[in-house]
């Protein structure tokens, strides 16, 4: 391995427990070994997921959160002894890898619970809620420190947990931790004084207006997590390590309002650095053996789950600062890179590096790092298209697919993640000659799957390069991981006997001598029938490098339009956005961490945004628009970029031996492109 990475593979201790290296796989929703949104079962898919990562040289593994009280059914976790019997059998196998595992137990979500439309009905309709209560007790699930508004639904409020309920939760943590310890689990992580979950809601003034022993003073607000670690230590002994998931600062300006990077002049309503310095020491003295750190709350979700737009290692400076106030180990997560993580550990600014979603994209990345095959690591691109499908548009949380609520920890670019039964390579019964028309991501993924199954594959690409429209999509300054993924695909393609014919446009599929044909010809931009359209350029033209002036009007406030606006800001230009809908990025399926960052960054940069506004005409020096009141006015600009979406451009229709993949089938995102390729190619 590279010399700079050697420090990542040195041992360290949490209490008296030695961990073999400094790489921590952080918890991700959907990877709970006790299942997620499914009561009374040990999740074998998650167990296999965790074991594969352990076999690939991870030091410490933290499975997804396990609610101390089942979300469905309301049963206390410690009451289900069968789960812990299976857990013990798993731990015996797990420990053969040399890795260690802490189970992450959560007190709950509180106001951060992502309520969908059905859940809202359970809350608002008392009769319906009573009927549903044995399955979904929404009143309890959403209970918080005080009556506070739900993050996802404008008119839903949490009720305060009672003191009796708090004591029950504390007792449940202790009982569950003992069962975990007896099953061979190496430690517990308490979830969480972090991200605005239930325990965090108790610690912060803006979500805690209690007047009893759990509200008011600093000590009272932090009493709940202190009582939990005290109870665990009393039951399991002082040597049983307990970690705390901890957000150093909240980066929160108010309900549903975060502070973006660079926005330093704001009033923190959550935990500021001064309080955090005190809290970290207070929590250490209470008995916690490690702080697993980042920043943010659900109101500033992009800090805890940083999308592509956030800087790499975005939480490191705050987390390394807090290490000065404790003597227990400190871990930092948040787009951590091995080089920066290793440097911080060497300089004693951190004890270990926390990584999460990179393990979804490539389960073997740590092994590749050790063996000096860094170029072969498939990079996470921070898209959140499959691992975090919770979006917020038109009032409540929504998802791409109902099943996503059960298993979130999937991966747009690695369908096998947490779906090993559905997506796995199997050799074809009969080897075929297969033509793939189009060398974009849909075409390349199809070719890789088909080649691994034993087929003879030829890609026909009309240009002189692979990756299709992703060449443009990956152009913005902050899309460096997208560009890394493009290079990964090119290298991966070269490892297989796949023929590529560049500068070859297929106009008649009948000229191909192929048993099966994959149409991966992508999509083209929509063109509005607007006077003066010749004075504008398409989004893809800008992303291809076409020059624009300093003042740029963007027609279309969807995801691409907003990403272009942010790219322009980073280049020192002044964008303004015209959008017909009543909000930016008004679509389902774009993760709230992504969309809220763009909305709030554009607001911070004072970008003019014209919602519910129609484009009437494009001129040499700007556009003519009409607002929702019917008022017509001019907007001045040096350049106009039109970004109103795309439409499929299949070469031919699908038939028995002709199959559509990617945007040629239906315009979507990278997840729909990659997964569709597998769905089609595993059947050939």
Describe every region a protein language model picked out:
Residues 587-591, 661-684:
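A conserved FAD-binding loop/helix module that cradles the flavin
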Residues 334-336, 357-358, 523, 645-646, ...:
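Active-site metal-binding loops of divalent metal-dependent hydrolases
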